[in-house]
């Protein structure tokens, strides 16, 4: 990569090292100080040479991406449900599959609902719901002070009113909610896939020997914090849907069901807190 490196050469170098074309384009746009919406600009200027400082920043960014660091950590931004969220290594990178959880919640919420997002991280779920439904009284909770700081910064920048609190799941809460929503840690402690996730916070990923410790805790605590007829919606692992549905049923939830992610895998499961009309 010595000499005058053109935009075309930079992209081809990244792709040759295993970086997906779209990610290579977004990474280069970041280095050039342009937005992710300017991919067409790259095509129109593919023979333009990078300045010396740009080449150095490109090399550094490419080394990080080839080394497995998630693109949002390098650029500092992640897109989720039409929102641009600030992210770094303090929080899990928002995944497109988690938008399934937001889609589902939006179909269930009554007028002016009270909703809580547990383990909010960057604030992705809470902010998406508040943005789509301004009438929602939105709460967001996380055990990590670092994660809460990032979520609060995102909320302030986006002008979205969220009530934040620090704590472990629903412990100590006295409010009741129309919906409890969470994308908790659900990877088993010894899962071999963790090797590919070393840049992300471990506490946001793993949950005991079977990956279900936090799911069990939330499902057990939720009935006391849900209004009659309120919903608990959870994201979980690709092979955990049946176990989560069983836990929901054992804990008295009705209308227990799952929703599929973008790959057609049962990725979210939930149930409704029984109301008087269900008895």
Predicted features along the sequence, with ranges:
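Conserved AdoMet
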Residues: 29-104
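Conserved SAM/SAH cofactor-binding pocket of Class I
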Residues: 93-194, 217
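Flexible, glycine-/basic-rich loop-and-beta segments that form/coincide
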Residues: 275-279
């Amino acid at each position: 990569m010595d000499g005058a490196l053109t935009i075309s050469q930079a992209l081809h170098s990244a792709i040759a090292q295993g970086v997906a074309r779209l990610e290579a384009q977004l990474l280069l746009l970041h280095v050039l100080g342009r937005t992710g919406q300017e991919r067409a600009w790259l095509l129109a200027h593919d023979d333009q040479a990078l300045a010396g400082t740009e080449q150095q920043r490109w090399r550094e960014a490419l080394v990080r991406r080839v080394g497995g660091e998630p693109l949002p950590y390098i650029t500092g931004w992640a897109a989720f449900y039409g929102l641009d969220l600030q992210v770094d290594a303090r929080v899990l990178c928002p995944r497109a599959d988690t938008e399934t959880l937001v889609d589902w919640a939006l179909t269930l919420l009554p007028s002016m609902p009270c909703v809580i997002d547990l383990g909010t991280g960057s604030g992705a779920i809470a902010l998406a719901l508040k943005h789509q439904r301004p009438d929602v009284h939105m709460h967001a909770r996380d055990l990590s002070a670092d994660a809460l700081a990032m979520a609060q910064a995102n909320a302030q920048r986006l002008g979205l009113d969220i009530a934040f609190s620090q704590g472990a799941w629903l412990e100590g809460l006295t409010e009741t909610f129309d919906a409890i929503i969470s994308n908790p840690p659900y990877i088993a402690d010894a899962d071999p896939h963790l090797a590919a996730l070393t840049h992300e916070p471990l506490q946001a990923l793993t949950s005991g020997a079977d990956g279900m410790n936090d799911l069990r805790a939330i499902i057990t605590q939720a009935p006391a914090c849900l209004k009659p007829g309120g919903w608990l919606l959870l994201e979980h692992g690709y092979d955990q849907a049946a176990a989560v549905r069983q836990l929901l049923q054992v804990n008295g939830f009705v209308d227990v069901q799952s929703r599929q992610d973008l790959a057609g895998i049962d990725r979210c499961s939930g149930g409704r807190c029984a109301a008087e009309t269900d008895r």
